[in-house]
Amino acid sequence: MFIGFVQDRMEDIMTQSEKALKLHEEWNGKITTTPKCEVKSREDLAIAYTPGVAEPCKVIAANKEEAYRYTIKSNTVAVVSDGSAVLGLGNIGAEAAMPVMEGKAVLFKEFGGVNAFPICLDTQDTEEIIKTVVNIAPAFGGINLEDISAPRCFEIETRLKELLDIPVFHDDQHGTAIVVLSGIINALKVVNKEKEDCKVIVNGAGSAGIAITKLLLRYGFKDVTLCDKSGILSKNSKDLNWMQKEMMEVTNLTGKTGTLADALKGADIFVGVSAPGIVSEDMVKSMNKDAILFAMANPVPEIMPDAAKKAGAKVVGTGRSDFPNQVNNVVAFPGIFKGALEGHAKQITEEMKLAAALAIAGLVDEKDLNEDNIMPEAFDPRVADVVSQAVKANIK
C-alpha cells in the first residue's frame, strides 16, 4: 500500500512540477516592486526624489529611529538564505534557492501584509553571512533566516540576535516549532491527556527537531526524547554536534538507548521531521492508547495517516494540504512578523513564540475540535491578525 501510494504521489508531483516550471517561466519571478507614490509631473519628481527627498534624509540622520516613519523599514523583512538546506533538495546554492525565497516573500505579503525581499547569499561561511546581514540590516525591520543548514543556523541566528536591534527569526526552527506546539495543544484536548503525563518522541535532530523540542519543554512537557537516523540520542551518542550535546542535558533524562522502534514503545506523541516511511504500523501499535502522530516529512510522511489510524493512532497531522490537520508554518510566520514590526519589537522572544502557538490553537473553537480538525486553515483570514496581536501583547 505504501509503495503504491508513493508511486501515485510521484505521478502527482510530476504533474505539479511541470505546471510549476511552466508558470515560473511565465511569471519570470513571483514578486515585483510597485511604487506607492505617483511620479507624473516635475512636482511629483521633486518631492519623491531630489530636492524634496533631502528633508526626510536629514530627519533620519538626526535620529535613525525615524526611518520607521519615513521609509519602508517599518513593514519590510529580508528573507535571507545561503541555499545550503533548501526543502528536500539539500545544498543547491544561492541562485537555485531564489524561487523558494521569492515564494516566501509572496506568503509574507499575501498572509500578513508584510513586504519581503529575497536575499540569497553566495557564501556559506558563517562569519561572512553574519557580516553581510549586519551590513544590510538598516534597510529592514526584521530578518527571516531561511534554509540554512544545521548546526550553522543556530550560531548565525544567535549572534545576529545579539548584534542587531531588529527581530531575527529562523523560520525553519521556530515557525515549525510554533505550529507543531499549537497542533499538539489541541490534539491533547481531543485525546484528553495532560502534557505533564505524556512521553514525546521527536525524530529528526536538525534545526526543526531541536527547536520543536525546546518549545515543547518550555511549554511544560517533561519527558521528551530526540532521535535521528542512528536511533535514540543520549549523552553517550557519537558524532553529536554542539547543539545536540546541549539538548542531551534536557532530553532523554533516563539515558535510554536503542532504535526509533524502541523509543516509540509506550510513547504518547510522535513528531517526525525526518524521512519518508520510517514509522511502521507495528511501531504505532506499540505506542500508548490514543497516540498523537505528526508525520511531517515531505512530500511523503514518516507514515501515511490511514496506516497510522489503522494501527491505533487517534490524531494524525502531516505537512500536506491533501490530508486533515496540515501543520504548516504559513499560519505562524506572517502574523509573527506582522506583530513584531507593528510593535517595533527588538527581538522575537520565547514568550512571543508561546503566545503565537496558543493563539493559533485558539482559532479552532473547542466545540469544533475533533481528531481531524486541530489546526486552523491557512486561508482563515483571522490567523495573521490574531497571531500578531498575541505577539504584540508580549513585547516588553
PLM segments and residue spans:
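General beta-strand structural signal in soluble alpha/beta enzymes
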Residues: 118, 144-147, 168-171, 202, ...
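Short glycine/serine/threonine-rich phosphate/pyrophosphate-binding segments
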Residues: 87-89, 153, 176-181, 203-214, ...
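Adenosine-phosphate binding glycine-rich loop
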Residues: 171, 295-396
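Rossmann-like adenosine-cofactor binding region
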Residues: 245-314, 320-322
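N-terminal ligand-binding/catalytic initiation module
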Residues: 11-166, 388, 394
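Short, Lys/Arg-enriched N-terminal segments with co-localized hydrophobic residues
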Residues: 1-13
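Glycine-rich phosphate/diphosphate-binding loop of Rossmann-like nucleotide-binding domains
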Residues: 92-109, 178-271
